């Protein structure tokens, strides 16, 4: 049986009468690419915000490895090895590409410059280290954001709609990059591009109305009648 690096049990977060996340059980296996999909309002972003500590848990528990991290704030979870790249690009536009990544490098990484350049090389931006981040194309800003995440040397990398706004050619390059991260890094992918999800993920979890509708391989999810009903046959239901 594959080991589990990140798990949630009974994870719940309500906002007034809205059951954004409602008793979710979830397992992320070490070294996998696991996609999280669901219709608009299904609870995807709230769920990963609970995992990363950006939103406090109302009830339930979160475990990283063998450690209960439910009560830890976001910055402490980063130190434990969870990196979360945001749905909207979050680079520092007035700083250089190099300085953006340098801010993310943990003290224990050793010498700063080799760590920064290694992360930039990984995402193909080493030759743009001195460029001001705000002058990068949108696609390159998304790559920079990923480089910042990799500089943290995460055990788990959460990618929230990483291909949003990318050209088709950039999406293909991004997919190749994500594949190169595993099994060293475990990836949780929230993505609206269903073709990419089916091609990239080893397993998929479908959320609907804040609850898990199904979990399985791409083939199992594609054949699941409950998933088909939730999506009403639409191609864009994971947005």
What are these regions, as identified by a protein language model?
Residues 2-239:
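Glycine-rich phosphate-binding loops of nucleotide-dependent enzymes
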